[in-house]
Amino acid sequence: QKWENHTSISDNVVKFFKQRGISQKTLIECRITEEEYYQPQLNKKTNNIVFNYFYGVTLLNKKFRSANKSFTQCKNAKKVFYGINDIEGEKECYIVEGEMDKLALWEAGYKNCISVPNGANDLNDVFETCGDELKNIDKFFIAVDNDEAGKKLEKALINRLGKWKCSKIEFVNGKDANDELIHSVFSLEDALKNPIDYPVEGTFNAVDVWDDIL
């Protein structure tokens, strides 16, 4: 069967996403676009994948990703979670560290997911803008990267949201949700279906007691 591009973006970009396990259907539904834009790290204009940050019907920000993985955003844009509209009316929410991970969860059927726009940075601004949306969530699943930056973000998120409202998603076949998807969608689904509760201060389990005895 002949390959066809059903999106409004170029074949090369669509094929890049395909290599990362992201389908054309997800690209269309998540409104991924393509645009020439100045990349400060490259000191020139270049073609970019564009992740569009909507808040309601308003496009508040764009994040631009070049072919060599340089990133930039619109200047002075209001900070919001990527995908904030997708948790409207939800009681559970998955939080990831990057737009590709948000798309990975969408691909696996988990649409109630948001991504921080800039790691552990700018969280004050993001929470200020999106506080009303977050206060309606009963349970958060922290699905950030398995590295030092991810641990920093994880700590910042559970401190803000409350450890008792959060569970951790662990990825065993890579550092993040997109790596897990590339391994297989079943691997990603397995990780998402097996969250780990954070121990709350003042509580302990049998292993803790046994360690003390030994």
Where in this protein do the model-derived segments appear?
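Acidic, metal-coordinating catalytic cores used for nucleic-acid/nucleotide bond scission
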Residues: 120-123, 144-154, 173
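Phosphate-handling DNA/RNA-contact segment within nucleic-acid enzymes
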Residues: 38-138, 154
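Acidic beta-strand-to-loop metal/phosphate-binding motif
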Residues: 93-95, 134-149, 169-170
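Short, surface-exposed amphipathic charged segments that create phosphate/polyanion-binding patches used
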Residues: 46-48, 128-135, 176-192
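TOPRIM metal-binding catalytic domain and adjacent DNA-binding surface shared by DnaG-type primases
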Residues: 1-56, 75-91, 193-213
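Structural alpha-beta junctions
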Residues: 113, 159-169
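Conserved beta-strand -> loop -> alpha-helix junction used to position metal-binding or nucleic-acid-contacting
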Residues: 166-179
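Short, aromatic/basic amphipathic alpha-helical patches
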Residues: 130, 152-163
